[in-house]
């Protein structure tokens, strides 16, 4: 199952997604490789490969699952060393007990959690790990708060990281035990166009008609104009992990 906002927005604006989204902190990538990089790693909702690329470069065997064709095409072009497949978290195209780690980077909030957790439990080997990874913006800076206010006008009922419904669903599933919770500041060097691209890559903004997208872009450009030609977009990179009962 793919939410309409994701299906429409990401299909139309995969390029903006790739330009506007931050990479993950090198320490987070190193931690993933060290603690979760052994065996087969299945990445759900892999997008354009923002996390897939450094994992494969570090020698991790990644099976990347992505439902949106435009994102999947970009992913396959950018990361030829990954196995790239069409699929969803609710219908994973892998055999029972076939992978060691299931990874969801910036994606678990999109899933139908009960159905996805059933599928994740099915494809994981006993004592396999479920790992979620996120880049989360720091809302304390006034310009970031202003950015969020503009973007969130269009959110409606779109699933969001900040609801934490995704985490409650995992923590409430008795098959999974929380084992890791880690974060690091991850300032992302950017420029005014990069922040506009970040806004346009937001699923529900990308699904708007062109006139509304243009209005969002103009408002965001006005917010960041005083920041100059280059500046940091304040993020933190987060990782949470759970172990499947063996």
Task: Give the location of each predicted region.
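Residues lining the SAM
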Residues: 100, 104-105, 133
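Conserved Class I S-adenosyl-L-methionine
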Residues: 168-246
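A short, conserved alpha-helix within the catalytic core of class I
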Residues: 111-119
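Class I SAM-dependent methyltransferase SAM/SAH-binding core
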Residues: 48-91
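Conserved catalytic/acceptor-binding region of the Class I
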Residues: 118-188
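Conserved class I S-adenosyl-L-methionine
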Residues: 1-37, 39-45
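A short acidic, Gly/Pro-enriched loop at the edge of an enzyme's catalytic core
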Residues: 90-101
């Amino acid at each position: 199952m793919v939410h309409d906002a994701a299906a429409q927005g990401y299909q139309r604006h995969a390029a903006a997604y790739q330009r506007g989204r931050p990479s993950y902190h090198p320490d987070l990538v190193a931690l993933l490789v060290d603690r979760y990089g052994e065996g087969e790693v299945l990445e759900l909702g892999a997008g354009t490969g923002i996390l897939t690329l450094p994992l494969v470069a570090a020698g991790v065997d990644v099976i990347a699952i992505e439902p949106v064709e435009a994102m999947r095409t970009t992913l396959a072009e950018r990361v030829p060393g990954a196995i790239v497949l069409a699929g969803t978290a609710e219908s994973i195209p892998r055999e029972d007990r076939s992978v060691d780690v299931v990874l969801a980077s910036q994606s678990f909030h999109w899933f139908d959690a009960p159905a996805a957790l059933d599928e994740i439990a099915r494809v994981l080997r006993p004592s396999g790990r479920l790992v979620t990874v996120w880049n989360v913006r720091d809302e304390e800076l006034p310009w970031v708060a202003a950015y969020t206010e503009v973007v969130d006008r269009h959110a409606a009922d779109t699933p969001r990281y900040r609801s934490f419904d995704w985490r409650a669903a995992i923590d409430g599933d008795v098959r999974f035990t929380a084992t890791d919770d880690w974060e690091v500041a991850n300032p992302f060097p950017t420029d005014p166009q990069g922040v506009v691209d970040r806004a346009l890559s937001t699923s529900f903004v990308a699904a708007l008609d062109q006139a509304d997208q243009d209005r969002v872009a103009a408002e965001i450009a006005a917010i960041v104009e005083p920041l100059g030609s280059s500046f940091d977009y304040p993020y933190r990179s987060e990782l949470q992990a759970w172990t499947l009962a063996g």
